[in-house]
A protein has these predicted regions:
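N-terminal leader/targeting pre-sequences
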Residues: 2-173
Length: 173
């Protein structure tokens, strides 16, 4: 009984402290895969990851509305946008971006993207809670809503979806 109570207490703490996601292509076509951790810090969420199998260059990286990634990441829906704002970049204010707009990650010549940044808008609670939502890596660079393309203010004109996964809670029990 003590072990159950201890695990419940740890789960409550972990829920507020760390999320994790394994990214992959559910269709198996792109070969893209990787891991991303979301760590609560005093000034926001630290997003740390490694993704392999990408074409070299920049790729849009977003949190999407739904936690459903079947059959080909399309069920993830649009960018996480509870405030109903236009698309923007991670440096834009909450009034000028979707909550899920995390900008771009960049793959090197070997197709590997390492990244480590802090986002002050996403969270593990309330209206901006990312737990149970999906992360999507896109085929093209996100123009951060400034590209002038008809899709710029909705998707950043980042193209198709190469890999996705659902953000879960990391626990030690």
């Amino acid at each position: 009984m003590i072990k159950i109570a201890l695990c419940a207490a740890i789960l409550a703490i972990a829920y507020a402290e760390e999320g994790t996601v394994y990214l992959f292509d559910p269709t198996g076509k792109s070969g893209v895969s990787g891991n991303v951790r979301f760590l609560q810090l005093p000034n926001g969420i630290n997003v740390v990851g490694e993704i392999r199998g990408l074409p070299p260059g920049k790729h849009g990286f977003h949190i999407h509305q739904e936690g459903n990634i079947s059959p080909s990441c399309l069920a993830a829906g649009g960018h996480f946008n509870p405030k109903k704002k236009l698309h923007g970049g991670p440096d834009d204010s909450v009034d000028h971006r979707h909550i899920g707009d995390l900008g771009n990650i960049e793959a090197d010549e070997n197709g590997i993207a390492f990244f480590n940044f802090i986002d002050s808008i996403i969270s593990f609670k309330g209206e901006t809670n990312i737990i149970g939502r999906s992360v999507v890596v896109h085929e093209k660079e996100d123009d951060l809503g400034k590209g002038g393309h008809p899709d710029s203010l909705q998707t950043g004109n980042a193209g198709g979806r190469l890999a996705c996964g659902v953000i879960g809670v990391k626990t030690i029990c």
